[in-house]
Curated annotation (Swiss-Prot):
This is Gene 30 protein. The keyword DNA-binding applies. Pfam families: HTH_3 (PF01381). It comes from the Viruses. Residues 12-66 form the HTH cro/C1-type domain. Disulfide bonds: none annotated.
Length: 73
């Protein structure tokens, strides 16, 4: 069986794992609803640029990890 948590591939999955693996916790820390996080997941797992600093702050992950399409790692 494949463990998807250890192989987070989308920026959203990486952010969720960084806060303990909970979409609800990530939503609370970022200041959005759990439904908003679920919508991001359904749309491919990219994070909104408008909340870039907030995602960096709450996850402790650098923008190069959270926004690989914008910043080269």
């Amino acid at each position: 069986m494949i463990n998807k948590k250890s192989n987070a591939s989308t920026p959203l999955e990486k952010a969720i794992n960084a806060v303990g693996g909970s979409q609800k916790v990530l939503a609370e820390k970022v200041g959005v609803t759990p439904q908003a996080i679920n919508m991001l997941k359904k749309r491919g797992g990219s994070l909104p640029v408008t909340k870039m600093r907030k995602y960096e702050e709450v996850t402790g992950l650098p923008r190069e990890v959270l926004y690989p399409g914008i910043f080269a790692a």
